[in-house]
Amino acid sequence: MKYGLIVFRETENIGDDIQSYAALKFLPKVDYYVEREHMDTFVPNNKEYVRVLMSGWFLHNKYNFDFSPYIYPFFISTHLSSYKTYGIENEHIKLFAPYLRKYGPIGCRDTHTHELLDKYKIDNYISGCITLTIDKLKTPKSKSKYICCVDVSNEVEEYIKQNTELKVITKTHRLDKKENMKLTYEERFENVRNLLKVYQNATLVVTSRLHCALPCLALGTPVILVTDDNSIYYKDRINSYLYCLSYYGEKDFLKTPIADLLKHKNKNSYLEIRNSLIKRIKDNINVPNSDEETLPDVKTFNNIYVKRKEKINKLLETLSNNYKETFDENYNLKCEVDYWKNNYNNALSDSKKAVSINDNYWRKEYNDLLKAKEEAVKANDDYWSKEYNDLLEKYNQLFNNKE
C-alpha cells in the first residue's frame, strides 16, 4: 500500500508543519506529499490508492473538492470551518457532504467541526488534535531554567520579564512563507523538532497558540494558554481543550503573580484523547482498499480532469483574491469607522466631562464671588450702619449738651 502525508507548502504558520510532523510517525513510509489545498488534483504515479491520514484544516479555500479518487482517506483530527471566506459560508459543506458520508465517521479536531457536521447529518465524533500524540524527543536537558513566550502580547512578555529572575526566551509560530517554501519537508520537520526541543526543556511555556500548547502537554512541559478576551473565532477553536489546558484571559494573567504561575502543573485529562487517537490511527491506517480496478486511468484523469480543474481553480483563486481584496478594504474601512466612532464617543464623553467640570468650576467661582460680594455688602452695610449710629449718637449728645 502507498501512503501520503498531508502538507501545506505555502503555510505562514509552523503549526501546520507541526501537525504534519505529528502524523508522520504513524505512516510506515511516505510515498507522496499530498498538498492540503490541492487535494482535488492529486495524481499518483500509478493507478493505485494512496492511504492518507486526514489531519488538519481542509477546504480553507472552500472550492477544492471532491478530493482526488486516488486518495483513500482516514479522517481524524479534521477541521472544517463555517466562517465566511470569500463570500462562501456553508455551501461547500453541503456539496462535500456525500464524500464525507462515504468515508465517515469523521474524527473532528474540535467542537466547531463536530457541530458543523452534525448540522448536515454527517456521522462524526470528536477525536481531538493529532499534536497531542507527539512523543518526547531525545535531547539533553537545559543547564539553566527558562520561560518560553510564544506569540503573546508585548504586555504579557514584559510582565513576565519584570517579575522573574529566570531567562525569558521568545519564539513565534509565524513563518516567512517564501523562505519556508525553499526548504525541503525534511528540513522543515527538522525545524519543528528544534522548536519542540525548546518547548520540552522549558520550565514554563506561555502561549496564545493552540498548536504550541497541545504539543507541550504531550511533551510534559508546563504550559499556560493566554486567551484572546474578545475573539469569538479563537474561543471556538480552544473550547474543545479547555478541560485539559490551564488558561487565562490576558487581563487575568497580568494580575497573577509569576511565582504562582511557576508552580503550575499540567492536567492529565489530555491522556485519554492522546491514547484514543493513537489507537484509532494504528487500527485504521493500514486498512487496505481492494477496489483499485474502479479507479480512472492516471494519464486520462490527468489530461482530462486535472488540467481542466487547475484552470478552473486558478480562475476561482483570482476571483477569490479579488473578493478578498475588496473584503479586506471594506474590513479596514469598517475598522477605521469603528475607531473614529469610538474615539468620537470617547471624545464626546470627555468633552461632556470637561464641560461639566468647567461648569462646576465656574459655578463654584460664581457662588464664591457672589458670597464674597454679599459678605462685602453686608460688611459695608454693617460698617456704615455702625458709623451712622455712632454719628447719630454723637449728634444727640451734642444736641443734648447744647440744651
State the predicted function of each range:
Residues K402-E403:
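Short acidic DE-rich linear segments
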Residues M1-N345, S349-D350, S356, Y395, ...:
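Active-site anion-handling motifs in enzyme catalytic cores
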Residues Y344, L348-S351, V355-W362, Y366-W384, ...:
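Residues forming the hydrophobic interface stripe of long heptad-repeat coiled-coil alpha-helices
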